[in-house]
Amino acid sequence: APALAAVRRRLEKAGVHPASLPLSIDIEAWLKRAKTGWDAFPNTGTGKIDAEVGPLASALAHPNVSLVTGADVTRLETDAAGRRVIAAVYRKDGAEHRISAGRFAVAAGAVQSAALLLRSSSTAHPAGLGNSSDQLGRNFMNHNTTAMLAIDPFAANSCVYQKTIAFNDFYNADNEYGFPLGNVQLLGHITGNILKANLPVPAPAWFARLMARHAYGWFLTSEDLPNPESRVMVRDGRIVMHWIRSNMRAHEALIGKTRAVMRKAGFPIVLTHTFGRKTTSHQCGTARLGADPQTSVVDLDCRSHDVENLYVTDASVLPTSAAVNPALTVAALAIKAGAAISRGH
């Protein structure tokens, strides 16, 4: 889009190095439905190449793959020795069911995967399934994130789909702070309605639309650091979260440096909103990967150190959060686990 090309040139003149984002978007399929942005919106069609449109649809084409929907997995059962999972127990339509298999992969997300394994405690695994290290549920991480609006009152933003560029000039440790600050990427186009709903004070719709017409939304991400006391727990059947924020000094430095870049690039009005603990930004870390069974939950192939046929294939296994979207890394680790299974690991 011409407007985005102009923003890119302005950023380059301001001294940063914007690059194109990797996108799993079929733009033609998306825009066929409606001329709307896609960032933060689900899509029931095929415009957004999410897990369902991509790998799940391909997997379901195989005759030996099936999907059970509306099922709430309550626990995994093991043999008497606790070395192998023999069944997953789930509830569907008010009834309890069991499904047996040779191997089990847990991929419910950093909170729910940890909770499932903690609920699956037994005589052989009193602290939770696969938790001899006492690391299960610990080291919960959730990115430090801020939304930034850069507004140019003299130039309209005509983009429909704008989440296409990012810059990492402040990511590496070669700055005056001595440690990484994070990633900056465009948000999807902020509409007047979105802006009106998120403004800290009430504002008329016309004012929100006017602001949105001249605004570019940016998403700033910094690492959350692993802390054993940031954890997911299960008490009386309920999930309990205890998250201790970290690395906010780096995030505040990222905000300051990015604000300076935007102003240098010709955006005199820069507004920011740092998200709190209610915002789930790439949760990870609760079943960390590692070579040492005493300090990690799964091995380098995402297999449980304690249970030979149990794998965890979601962001739970990430030992650090980095400061970028984790989906491609999670996919790569799942492929690595699949390769290990096919080798008979």
Name each model feature, range by range.
Residues 43-50, 92, 127-131, 135, ...:
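Alpha-helix capping and helix-loop boundary segments enriched in small/acidic/polar residues
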Residues 1-73, 276-277, 283, 288:
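Conserved redox-cofactor binding core of oxidoreductases
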Residues 21, 34-39, 68, 74-79, ...:
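A glycine-rich dinucleotide-binding beta-alpha-beta segment and adjacent secondary-structure elements
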Residues 319-341:
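A conserved FAD-binding loop/helix module that cradles the flavin
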Residues 15, 92, 133-248, 252, ...:
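FAD cofactor-binding and catalytic pocket of flavoenzymes
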Residues 3-4, 48, 52, 250-254, ...:
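Hydrophobic (often cysteine-bearing) scaffold residues that line and stabilize catalytic clefts
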Residues 62, 71, 75-83, 88-160, ...:
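Glycine-rich loop(s) and the adjacent beta-strand/alpha-helix scaffold that form part
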Residues 57-61, 91-98, 289, 295-305:
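A short acidic-Thr-Gly-centered motif at the start of a beta-strand
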